[in-house]
Design a protein with these regions (language model features):
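Conserved beta-strand-loop surface patch within small alpha/beta domains used
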Residues: 1-136, 143-246
């Protein structure tokens, strides 16, 4: 029996080189090491390591998320409304949702998939087909908890999908944080990467932070490259270990 190789390791010779691995692939590019994966609804590339010294014979890689069809912003707005109605501010409990794409119509739909709920956690109905095939897995967080938790990292391992948290859902300024996960490698992304429009009444935390970082770099002026080079130097020390372990 011919057993397919689920994980592939390769060099990137063209920027449009197709993703062929059934599970995921590790790619050495001109500018770093990347993990790439694809499924029916999307393909994604996450940077694992940036090279301080480029490899001119190879093509440059770039982190990205591309959906076959972007998720309507209204889906996230509906989930927020449902989350607000299912719990009140005084007795908050987390809730979990799966966003899926219908294989026949191509339309997106969402479903609540919590098996149990408490103030600081929610457990999924992992036998639910919506949870198993979700493009986006998103859950609510207690007020003020604006980062993915260590428990989130554990729960979201071993999957290739989008992940999200909704925070401060009963406040005047509810917020959302999104990321893509490729089998234990995560990259936070702004909502505009995956939605057809900015979700109304939701602060995009990743976009907000990126804009703030751009402002800081602009304020640094000529000193900004020194900070960037220092970060590249720090990252360069781990380049060899990534390559040796491929």
């Amino acid at each position: 029996m011919n057993i397919p190789q689920l994980v592939e390791r390769k060099f990137l010779f063209a920027s449009d080189q197709p993703i062929t691995a059934p599970l995921y692939e590790i790619v050495i590019a001109q500018n770093g090491v990347f993990k790439r994966a694809r499924r029916r609804e999307m393909q994604a590339v996450v940077e694992l390591s940036a090279f301080a010294v480029k490899i001119p014979e190879l093509a440059a890689g770039e982190a990205r998320v591309e959906l076959t069809e972007k998720i309507p912003a209204s889906v996230l707005e509906e989930i927020l409304a449902h989350a607000r109605s299912e719990t009140d501010a005084a007795n908050f409990t987390e809730n979990l949702y799966a966003v899926c794409r219908d294989t026949e119509t191509g339309n997106y739909f969402w479903k609540e998939v919590s098996r149990s709920r408490s103030f600081g956690s929610t457990i999924a109905c992992d036998d639910d087909s919506a949870y198993q095939t979700a493009v986006l897995e998103i859950h609510t967080h207690p007020p003020g908890c604006r980062e993915f938790s260590n428990q989130d990292d554990c729960d979201e391992r071993g999957k290739f999908r989008l992940f999200g948290i909704l925070v401060d859902i009963h406040s005047d300024n509810p917020a959302i944080r999104l990321r893509v996960g490729i089998y234990d490698s995560f990259w936070e992304i702004p909502a505009e990467f995956i939605t057809d429009a900015p979700p109304e009444n939701l602060t995009d935390l990743v976009k907000q932070e990126k804009e703030r970082l751009a402002e800081i770099c602009n304020d640094l002026g000529d000193d900004a490259p020194e900070y960037i080079l220092a970060e590249e130097y720090r990252a360069a020390t781990v380049n060899l270990s990534y390559v040796e372990n491929l």
